[in-house]
Amino acid sequence: MAQYYTTMNLKSRFAPSPTGYLHLGNARTALFAWLAARGAGGTFILRLEDTDQQRSPEIYERALLEDLRWFGIDWDEGPDRGGDHGPYRQMERLAVYGRYYAHLQSSGQAYACYCSADDLAAERAVQRSAGKAPRYGGRCRHLDAAARAEREAAGLLPTLRFRVPDQGTLTVPDLVWGERHYALADLGDFVIRRSDGSPAFFFANAVDDALMEVNLVLRGEDHLTNTPRQILILQALGLPVPAYGHLPLLLGADGQPLSKRYGAASLRDLRKDGYLAAALRNYLARLGHHYSATGFLDSRALAQGFALNQISRAPSHFDMVQLQHWQHEAVQSLDDAAVWNWLAPLLRGKVPMGLEMPFVAAVRANILLPGDALDWAERCFGAPALAADAVEAITGVSPEFWSVAQATLQASGGDYRRWTKALQQASGRRGKALFMPLRAALTGLTHGPELAALLPLIGEERALARLHAAARRPSTPIETTL
């Protein structure tokens, strides 16, 4: 039944509905499908399932393409670049679907259904009260031409239903879940065209995959129950059936599936926060997929290490702490110039000209997001606020210590090593007792980058002013030494 791909002809796709900004669950689906194609040297298609016109404004299509490109995903065929199997928007393919609807109707495998939403709701309620699974009972299945004409004369607009065989079992192989078996009698006849003439998801999605020669479909676990219906459609039309693999759910911190309708973080949100695409790729690629390599990987290595048999069935939980780990790894993978290019939109005018690279070299190990770098720019070149523990460290030494610190700094000409060695000898302080108050006075924090790298950025004049300000704070009564 399923026409399995080979590494010579693998063709996968991402087929989102542009009804909102790309959320992380769909971003992971796109990434897995892209990694499968790129790892095998295959083809990757982007197709837009835009039949929900009320929820698919053009702004979301533009945003989707922009976000995917930023994420590092490219495509060989798609709505913006064309291809041999277009068009790549479903609303531009209605004539294509019409031909296949006509075929199913002429062969008796589809029929017009005039049941109203109220009729169907009442039928489902009766089935539930009897302890049965809801399914269409087939009220319109055997209407003759006269009965159909009567209903249409009354202004009823029919849907089109696929006629499911009354008996038998359909076996569906899945690359993640293995074989699953469905009793056809439990499926019920399902809608393949809405009453307004627009195609239902089951139908358009399956037909497009076949006509675009997609032979590997990776999508979310929530589509598992769609698969038997789509295979029935393809078999009825004599179209090829792709290999299906359904990815485990991606859950939020609350244990609920991530969804763009219910406030899930979007790729765009994280991009605006300053997260790097490489960090998100490394993290999402590992949510539901095992890599033998545990370190940071570029896109090529992620694709080469991707294997369908390494996809887990267990749901994955999105964890910001883990994303921050990969963000740190991504930042550290960049050279200083690339880090500056990432930070520059926020830091222009905050870092003196000529000090951009020394600033990056000094603080890069201490930043996850551009906002962190902005804080360090203020601490180096502005008027930093003092943290509570910094005030405690400053007031824990005597004013005389600060006087000696100023004098030895001036004598050293701003050389950090000479200064701290002279101050150690003059004050009798060493280690944390020496460096903690200095760090607190110079940066307003008790932690951070190496002071040796920060002092040239702060500059001797600014450093002296901060040491002088520290001397003016009253020391605590327990201070007995310089």
Curated annotation (Swiss-Prot):
GO terms for cellular component: cytosol. SUPFAM superfamilies: An anticodon-binding domain of class I aminoacyl-tRNA synthetases, Nucleotidylyl transferase. GO terms for molecular function: ATP binding; glutamate-tRNA ligase activity; tRNA binding; zinc ion binding. Binds 1 zinc ion per subunit. It holds the Pfam family Anticodon_2. It catalyses: tRNA(Glu) + L-glutamate + ATP = L-glutamyl-tRNA(Glu) + AMP + diphosphate. Its EC number is 6.1.1.17. It comes from the Bacteria. One of its GO terms (biological process) is glutamyl-tRNA aminoacylation. Zn(2+) binds at residues 113, 115, 140, 142. Keywords: Aminoacyl-tRNA synthetase, ATP-binding, Cytoplasm, Ligase, Metal-binding, Nucleotide-binding, Protein biosynthesis, Zinc. Its main location: cytoplasm. A motif ('KMSKS' region) lies at residues 257-261. PANTHER family: GLUTAMATE--TRNA LIGASE, GLUTAMATE--TRNA LIGASE, MITOCHONDRIAL-RELATED. Monomer. Belongs to the class-I aminoacyl-tRNA synthetase family. Glutamate--tRNA ligase type 1 subfamily. HAMAP family: Glu_tRNA_synth_type1 (MF_00022). This is Glutamate--tRNA ligase 2. The gene is gltX2.
